[in-house]
Design a protein with these regions (language model features):
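Hydrophobic core segments of transmembrane alpha-helices in multi-pass, intramembrane catalytic enzymes
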Residues: 1, 43-51, 123, 127
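Generic transmembrane alpha-helix motif of multi-pass integral membrane proteins
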Residues: 1-15
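Interfacial aromatic-anchored transmembrane helix boundaries in multi-pass membrane proteins
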Residues: 17-57
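Hydrophobic transmembrane alpha-helices
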Residues: 4-7, 51-59, 127-135
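Hydrophobic membrane-targeting signal helices
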Residues: 6, 20-21, 82
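Hydrophobic alpha-helical transmembrane segments
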Residues: 12-17, 41-46, 69-77, 117
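Short helix-capping/hinge motifs at transmembrane helix termini and TM-loop junctions
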Residues: 8, 31, 95-96
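Membrane-embedded alpha-helical hairpins and interfacial helices in multi-pass inner-membrane proteins
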Residues: 61-148
């Protein structure tokens, strides 16, 4: 989300490649069980891309104004919702580890999604606080430059 707001589009491919390399190492040498490796693994690309797109769409609102930060936070939560639905939904449907019923999926979402949303909210708020501090510092420097 934050990277989508700050970095060029080509860096998404770089980050996805890095994630695949880290996962390959973890599955091959790190002792991580391959239960997450299924057709659903490929769905991480659109899942993460939904977060990236949310960041790209929100970047125009990052003007330093409170309303813009609220829009940024809204995009962060919307991107998180799409990412969660794509990643968890595809893993649930295609991993072969679960009985694919709506009630089972929803019970798992109610168990695990709050942690996903709270993590995204934490990082979005941390970014907003950092942006507020940065904007305040830039304004102070500009005013200081005008007074000399």
């Amino acid at each position: 989300m934050i990277a989508g707001a700050l970095l060029p589009l080509w860096s998404f491919a770089w980050f996805m490649s890095l994630a695949v390399l880290i996962d390959a190492y973890a599955f091959t040498f790190g002792g991580v069980p391959g239960t997450g490796l299924s057709f659903a693994y490929g769905m991480l690309i659109p899942a993460y891309f939904s977060m990236w797109v949310a960041g790209r769409l929100s970047k125009f609102y990052l003007t330093g104004e409170p309303a813009g930060f609220a829009v940024f936070f809204g995009f962060a939560m919307l991107g998180t919702a799409f990412c969660e639905l794509i990643s968890s939904g595809s893993f649930y449907l295609w991993s072969g580890n679960f009985e694919p019923t709506l009630s089972e999926f929803l019970s798992r979402e109610f168990e695990y999604a709050p942690a996903t949303f709270s993590s995204s909210a934490y990082w979005a708020v941390a970014f907003i606080v950092g942006s507020v501090v940065s904007h305040a510092y830039q304004k102070a420097r500009a005013l200081q430059g005008l007074s000399h």
